[in-house]
From Swiss-Prot:
Its main location: nucleus. This is Glucose starvation modulator protein 1. It is found in: Nucleus. Keywords: DNA-binding, Metal-binding, Nucleus, Transcription, Transcription regulation, Zinc. Belongs to the ERT1/acuK family. The gene is GSM1.
Length: 565
């Protein structure tokens, strides 16, 4: 039995740099001297030696070459041989060597396996094939990824091909093209419908559509005429990817997206090639929009949004609702649809500004939001007004060059902070339809009713503003502290930054940028200085509470201020 050590002995014990073989196997505490104490106690001191550690590959100099060589040196599993395989010609040996990697990689199984079968059937040196050679052919016949009806038929007598290393290793360009998704969606599909369409010249010579049909067979990489992938899952994935390429129109403030994605609307969906047998190619001299509409109607269409040019006008199409995308030119809505009764009432989609003094008097209860007219809030105009205000605050003609430079540096800091989170806001809201914007505004007004009731029960002065800084509510005591009238602050577009000094504005944007995206912190404590109407400064300690919308984007900021006397 192992002797129990005292606490002092345990403290004095130090682990050995390297254990001996015996201590390593028995998981004992070895000592640094040789022979060690454990081996001396057991009378095996003559065999006490350091354990040989296994060195890692990067220390021994072994790299990728060593790994490859070890894999290549591994003996392959031998197939069940036959008398034919024992007396194999040099060409046959090359064929068997090349068949195994093709079988494992499964890149071009259809073409190569067909070529191998033809070679087996037409090899003059091969005599009658025994019956036990059939398992070899069964192993070599891998189920193809595509239908191989377009390949060489090995059953036709007299068919003979020359089996060389070049035509075995070099794949068919069209087969490789159909097996590459990126090439298919960018190269092959764009040949059928683009601005410099090749068919226009073909149709001018021959209008019967035969050249077009032949080019469609070639360009589609043997996927036309009803031939599809063998996997239903892969077919559905190709359908959805093709619909996204054809119909999705990206709306982004970056110029790179607007120059390429929005203008390239004439790309044909790859999913339509499996259904081209339903389309009359003789009518391809009609406009492109009608052709694309036929491609859509040939199967149940999966869409994430239509472009304005190719939006269908058939009310029976299940994607027609998404044709009316959100644009900057928002039009009025007069007809009530069969959709959500909460949203579909007499509502106007407008970019006109409605001051908070009107909305606060209009929506005094929750039922008013559903019974009275509601207008959406257009945030881009609010951000433009904010930018103009910041330029006025941090500008000035009667300042020294040093003061101008200091104010300019602060303005640049603020604009960089706004640019850090505003693209995320745009990305979250760019695909929203007009009813979604109304729903967000209704959520804001409904939350505002609750917060205004809470502010009446709270003794601290309170101001509420949108994420742009636009004031939407202020208590009377806070307005009196700042020597303002609450009606004057709410009758027009006013920002909370008009009531702060320069340093407080910079501090606020630093805090807001940290919690605007990613960080879901909802409470911020800080100290700021507010300006009165007579340009006096009052120092406040304040708490900012952030209310977020369904996209976790700040919707309302509730600021509670306590003056420091």
């Amino acid at each position: 039995m192992t002797k129990k050590l005292t606490p002092q002995e345990k403290k004095n014990r130090k682990p050995a740099v390297r254990a001996c073989v015996f201590c390593h196997q028995k998981h004992l505490q070895c000592s640094n001297e040789r022979p060690c104490k454990n081996c001396v106690k057991r009378n095996i001191a003559h065999g006490c030696k350091d354990i040989v550690r296994k060195r890692v590959k990067y220390l021994t100099g072994e790299g990728v070459s060593g790994t490859v060589s070890s894999k290549q040196s591994t003996p392959r599993k031998k197939l069940k041989t036959s008398p034919l395989s024992t007396s194999m010609s040099p060409t046959d040996s090359m064929k068997s060597d090349l068949a195994t990697p093709v079988e494992s990689s499964n890149h071009f199984p259809a073409s190569i396996s067909s070529s191998v079968d033809v070679m087996t059937a037409t090899q003059p040196s091969a005599m009658n094939t025994p019956s036990d050679a059939q398992p070899i052919n069964d192993i070599l016949e891998v189920p193809p990824l595509f239908d191989n009806s377009h390949m060489i038929n090995s059953d036709v007598p007299g068919t003979n091909i020359t089996l060389t290393t070049q035509n075995l290793i070099t794949p068919d360009p069209l087969s490789f093209h159909t097996n590459t998704v990126s090439n298919t969606t960018t190269d092959v599909l764009n040949k059928l419908l683009n601005d410099n369409y090749e068919t226009e010249s073909l149709l001018s010579v021959n209008n019967n559509g035969d050249h077009l049909l032949e080019m469609a067979h070639t360009s589609s990489g043997h996927l036309s005429n009803g031939q599809q992938f063998q996997s239903n899952y892969l077919n559905e994935e190709y359908m959805m990817l093709g619909d996204i390429i054809l119909q999705s129109k990206q709306v982004s403030p970056s110029p790179s997206n607007t120059s390429t994605s929005e203008n390239n609307t004439n790309t044909l969906s790859p999913s339509s090639f499996g259904y081209m047998s339903n389309i009359n190619f003789e009518d391809f001299n009609q406009p492109k929009k009608k052709v694309v509409q036929k491609l859509k109607d040939s199967r149940p269409f999966i869409s994430l949004g239509f472009t304005e040019e190719l939006a269908p006008h058939d009310s029976s199409n299940n994607a027609d609702y998404y044709g009316h995308r959100m644009t900057n030119d928002i039009v009025g809505k007069t007809d009530e649809g069969p959709g959500n009764p909460i949203i579909n009432y007499n509502t106007k989609f407008t970019t006109d500004y409605v001051p908070p003094s009107i909305t606060n008097n209009l929506y005094k209860t929750a039922s008013d939001l559903y019974s009275k007219e509601l207008k959406n809030f257009y945030y881009p105009l609010s951000y433009h007004a904010l930018t103009k205000l910041l330029k006025v605050i941090f500008g000035g003609n009667n300042l020294s060059p040093e003061e101008k430079q200091e104010k300019r540096s602060k303005l640049l800091i603020i604009l960089k902070l706004i640019a850090s989170y505003r693209p995320t806001f745009i990305a979250a809201h760019r695909d929203l339809i007009q009813e979604d914007l109304l729903m967000l505004e209704m959520t804001l007004q409904r939350s505002l009713l609750d917060y205004k009731k809470l502010a009446e029960l709270n003794s601290s002065p309170t101001i509420m503003w949108r994420r742009t800084g636009e004031i939407i509510s202020i208590t009377e005591d806070m307005a009196l502290l700042l020597e303002h009238s609450s009606f004057d602050l709410l009758k027009e577009r006013r920002f909370i930054f008009e009531l702060m000094d320069d340093n407080s504005i910079v501090d606020y944007f630093n805090l807001f940028a940290n919690i605007a995206v990613g960080n879901l912190k909802s409470v911020i404590q800080t100290a700021i200085q507010m300006k009165t109407k007579s340009s006096n400064l009052i120092k406040f300690t304040c708490v900012f509470t952030i209310k977020r919308d369904i996209f976790d984007i700040p919707m309302i900021v509730i600021g509670q201020f306590l003056p420091i006397v």
